[in-house]
Amino acid sequence: METLSFEFPAGQPPRGRALVGCVGSGDLEVLIEPGLAGRLTINVQTSVNGAEQRWQHLFARMFDGTTPPAMAIDIHDFGATPGVVRLRLEQGFEEIGHD
């Protein structure tokens, strides 16, 4: 089990919160809450040791060149594929946009 932390530049915090997925369904749960202005923080608890570079590349592809809202994202992973991670994150972003 590893705990990883990532940070990216961001804009203003959203008003909404979201919880998508669950560890038993697709092996991934994502919790999204408003963060501190200017910072997007991501904490990942994963059962896959040695995968930090994979996570870093996934987040870089999603957030480089954009200004996402300032969010605090917690991910609980039990071996999800990068495609499932991206899907769950996009579902969460859609949910916070509905507030």
Curated annotation (Swiss-Prot):
Keywords: Cytoplasm, Phosphoprotein. The keyword NADP does not apply. Covalently binds the prosthetic group of malonate decarboxylase. InterPro entries: Mal_deCO2ase/Cit_lyase_ACP (IPR023439), Malonate_deCO2ase_dsu (IPR009662). The modification O-(phosphoribosyl dephospho-coenzyme A)serine is found at S25. It comes from the Bacteria. Subunit of malonate decarboxylase, it is an acyl carrier protein to which acetyl and malonyl thioester residues are bound via a 2'-(5''-phosphoribosyl)-3'-dephospho-CoA prosthetic group and turn over during the catalytic mechanism. Belongs to the MdcC family. This is Malonate decarboxylase acyl carrier protein. It comes from Pseudomonas fluorescens (strain Pf0-1).
